[in-house]
């Protein structure tokens, strides 16, 4: 297995990553993958995985190339699969097409693959190289990769606040702290997530739909994705007291709703896309995330109030903290960002490290990782 890469290798893998990104709103629970086939320095085929059950990126690129695939180098953003699932193995497809070399951005930690795809290629006499633009490939599939490695989804906690760290007026009024551009960005982030997590308190207070509103997408994304192709996230509602009712706006949008609680209730009054997810009383977030991982939830976008935000942080259940900051001051009577009732000493305050800072219209979008996850 070779690991020496040329400038052309980097160029074509970058294109494969750009193709893979086109699937980020549609592929879950599968990863987003792109593939480029190159022969004599020219692209002869390319493709990306669009949706679970449809052809994988390698198969799309091979179909695009036809007979020109023979003798080509395949650049793929994730190790080709080697098992029969909803579709045949991609490693086998590359072998049958007669490609001369395969370059993978990274190995696939999926236990069904995990080096078996590269071995299948090697056994067929096809040289391969791995770990080209690995960090970019990892960033593209944070949810899938975490679930494969730990059995749990990648959790992004979204918060919106004023310059003085407030999320709403004392009365609860919060529409809208941030501007139109930031709220449109939230729609994109919702669409990338497998599931959206909130609480019955939020449902009762705001009666939100918690769906992806395609009409708020930027024009370039609308041109790229028809409304019916964008995946709606599973709406997961923590509802320990069974307070959510069929009349709530959640059920006016036909996408799955999972009500998480410990007390069985009559689900026959709810639409058929709603189910109750029963967990033991006083369950913790580790158990919840493990159960969601078993249900093939790759990533979770959290939108809730200060209670859930604080609880997730205290239980170290947040992989990424995303804060939208509006250029407003709400005063000391306004509501705070998160509740951390057990925090008494400054030395014990959770530490986060800024990863990205982006201007979104008149607002800022800040992305943080927990300090314990940061590589030295």
Where are the predicted features?
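Flexible, gly/pro- and Lys/Arg-enriched active-site loops
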Residues: 314-352
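Short beta-strand scaffold segments in enzyme catalytic cores
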Residues: 32-41, 159-160, 366
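Short, basic/aromatic recognition patches
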Residues: 8-28, 147
């Amino acid at each position: 297995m070779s690991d020496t890469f040329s400038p052309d290798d980097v160029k074509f893998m970058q294109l494969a990553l750009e193709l893979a990104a086109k699937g980020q709103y549609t592929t879950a629970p599968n990863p987003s993958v792109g593939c480029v086939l190159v022969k004599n320095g020219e692209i002869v085929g390319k493709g990306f995985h669009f949706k679970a059950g449809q052809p994988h990126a390698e198969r799309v690129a091979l179909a695009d190339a036809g007979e020109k695939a023979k003798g080509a180098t395949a650049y793929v953003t994730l190790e080709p699969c080697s098992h029969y699932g909803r579709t045949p193995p991609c490693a086998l497809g590359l072998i049958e097409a007669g490609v001369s070399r395969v370059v993978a951005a990274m190995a696939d930690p999926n236990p069904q693959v995990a080096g078996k795809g590269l071995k299948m290629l090697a056994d067929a006499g096809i040289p391969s190289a791995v770990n080209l633009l690995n960090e970019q490939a990892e960033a593209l599939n944070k949810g899938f990769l975490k679930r494969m490695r730990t059995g749990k989804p990648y959790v992004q906690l979204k918060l919106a606040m004023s310059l003085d760290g407030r999320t709403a007026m004392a009365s609860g009024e919060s529409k809208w702290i941030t501007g139109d551009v930031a709220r449109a960005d939230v729609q994109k982030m919702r669409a990338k997530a497998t599931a959206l997590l909130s609480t019955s308190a939020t449902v009762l207070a705001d009666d939100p739909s918690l769906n992806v509103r395609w009409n708020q997408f930027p024009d370039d994304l609308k041109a790229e994705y028809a409304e019916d192709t964008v995946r709606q996230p599973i709406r997961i509602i923590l509802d320990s007291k069974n307070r959510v009712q069929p009349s709530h706006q959640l059920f006016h949008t036909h996408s799955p709703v999972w009500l998480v609680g410990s007390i069985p209730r009559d689900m026959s009054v709810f639409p058929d896309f709603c189910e109750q997810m029963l967990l033991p009383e006083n369950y913790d977030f580790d158990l919840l995330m493990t159960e969601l991982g078993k249900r093939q939830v790759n990533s979770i976008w959290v939108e809730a109030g200060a209670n859930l935000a604080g609880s997730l942080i205290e239980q170290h259940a947040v992989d990424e903290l995303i804060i939208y900051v509006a250029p407003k001051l709400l005063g000391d009577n306004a509501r705070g960002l998160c509740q951390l009732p057990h925090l008494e000493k400054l030395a014990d305050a959770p530490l986060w490290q800024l990863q990205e800072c982006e201007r979104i219209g008149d607002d800022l979008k800040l992305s943080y990782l927990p300090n314990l996850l940061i590589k030295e």
